[in-house]
Amino acid sequence: MSSTTQAPGPVYQWTADEAVQFLKEWNFSLGIILLFITIILQFGYTSRSMFIYVVKMIILWLMWPLIIVLCMFNCVYALNNVYLGFSIVFTIVSVVMWIMYFVNSIRLFIRTGSWWSFNPETNNLMCIDMKGTVYVRPIIEDYHTLTATIIRGHFYMQGVKLGTGFSLSDLPAYVTVAKVSHLCTYKRAFLDKVDGVSGFAVYVKSKVGNYRLPSNKPSGADTVLLRI
């Protein structure tokens, strides 16, 4: 009994004309999408608009899963062994970095208890206690000094508005910046009043240690930290 094997069908490949035609049909839509993403990434800062910043974080958060899916797709439909090898390496690197992101974010969440720990842009979280309310916001760089400003009751930290109804007397003696591996404590070194309801304070980095913020902290206990 004889068996017949069917020859594999030809692999379809785009021609240059088809690629040009595809770009002509989708160029406008792709341009709008890329322009939108560029504007969000360019102007998405907490000091400008919290809504735009959150959208920026969502876009950055979706980048790694999208890259992993594309790398896996390249592994399945590799053009040759060279492309397959590079695709496997890129997939492994993407998955490892994605896992490292979650590990670091969970460690930072344990230290601060804030969902800002899952911010994909930075692992620096500034924490300040104002009248029993702890405000947590991400900061991009590792600053040696931090500036708190009160303008007619409006409270700003590093240029980011955090709340209203505060005075200079409400500013704490210490501010902390949480990182994955340690917690930096900043001590208030300078306080200046511009008028009766406005002024600013400068905090200088004074201590670094392996601490976490307590979940419940009594009023005025600015230096109470829990070692981990």
Curated annotation (Swiss-Prot):
Intravirion topological domain: 47-56, 107-228
UniProt topological domain (Virion surface) ranges: 2-25, 78-85
Its membrane topology: Multi-pass membrane protein
Q: Which UniProt keywords apply?
A: Glycoprotein, Host Golgi apparatus, Host membrane, Host-virus interaction, Membrane, Transmembrane, Transmembrane helix, Viral envelope protein, Viral immunoevasion, Viral matrix protein, Virion
Is NAD one of the keywords? no
Single GO molecular function: structural constituent of virion
Record-level GO cellular component terms: host cell Golgi membrane; membrane; viral envelope; virion membrane
Q: What residues form the membrane-spanning segments?
A: 26-46, 57-77, 86-106
Per UniProt, subcellular location reads as: Virion membrane; Host Golgi apparatus membrane
InterPro entries found in the cross-reference section: M_CoV, M_HCoV-like
Function noted in UniProt: Component of the viral envelope that plays a central role in virus morphogenesis and assembly via its interactions with other viral proteins.
Instruction: Cite the record's note on assembly.
Output: Homomultimer. Interacts with envelope E protein in the budding compartment of the host cell, which is located between endoplasmic reticulum and the Golgi complex. Forms a complex with HE and S proteins. Interacts with nucleocapsid N protein. This interaction probably participates in RNA packaging into the virus.
| Family affiliation | Belongs to the betacoronaviruses M protein family.
| Identification of the protein by name | Membrane protein
**Annotated gene:** M
